[in-house]
Regions:
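N-terminal small/glycine-rich loop or linker at the start of catalytic domains
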Residues: 1-13, 47-49, 57, 75
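Short, conserved beta-strand segments within well-ordered enzyme catalytic domains
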Residues: 5, 33-35, 87-91
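Conserved, mostly hydrophobic/aromatic
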Residues: 7, 26, 101
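Active-site beta-loop-alpha junctions enriched in small/polar residues
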Residues: 9-11, 37-41, 93-95
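Glycine-rich anion/phosphate-binding loops
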Residues: 13-25, 71-72
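Catalytic domains of carbohydrate-active enzymes, especially glycoside hydrolases
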Residues: 21-39, 104-105
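Glycine-rich, proline-tolerant flexible connector loops at the mouths of alpha/beta enzymes
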Residues: 32-68
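Active-site beta->alpha loop and helix N-cap motifs at the rims of alpha/beta catalytic domains
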Residues: 55-109
Length: 109
């Protein structure tokens, strides 16, 4: 049986409202899973560390800080996903990010 994963990643660009809308759009498209990324800047990068050119005027550290959701926000995204009958999946990029996913009982990471 095939499963469709809607890779949202960080395409919400730090907007919680956009993240909610992207989940709803994933449902309309028939997705079985929605997948986010969870970054915690302090555990992944240093302030003012060199960044790839696609980060434009923002360094990687600030980008991760601006686009990360807190525990409560992630919990709300998970609840909406499950309410719509999909599975919530997150890629953690540090052990600390994984700890947050475990607190939320995220099953897929």
């Amino acid at each position: 049986m095939k499963k469709i994963i809607a890779e949202i990643g960080s395409s919400h660009d730090g907007s919680f409202g956009n993240a909610m809308k992207l989940i709803e759009e994933a449902k309309k498209c028939g997705a079985d899973f929605v997948k986010f990324q969870h970054h915690i800047a302090e555990f992944e990068s240093l302030p003012n560390a060199p960044s790839p050119s696609y980060f434009k005027s923002e360094d990687r550290f600030e980008y991760f800080r601006r686009t990360s959701f807190d525990l409560e926000q992630l919990g709300t995204l998970k609840k909406l996903t499950e309410k719509l009958g999909m599975n919530f999946m997150v890629s953690p990029f540090s052990e600390e990010a994984l700890d947050i996913l475990k607190k939320l009982n995220v099953k897929f990471y």
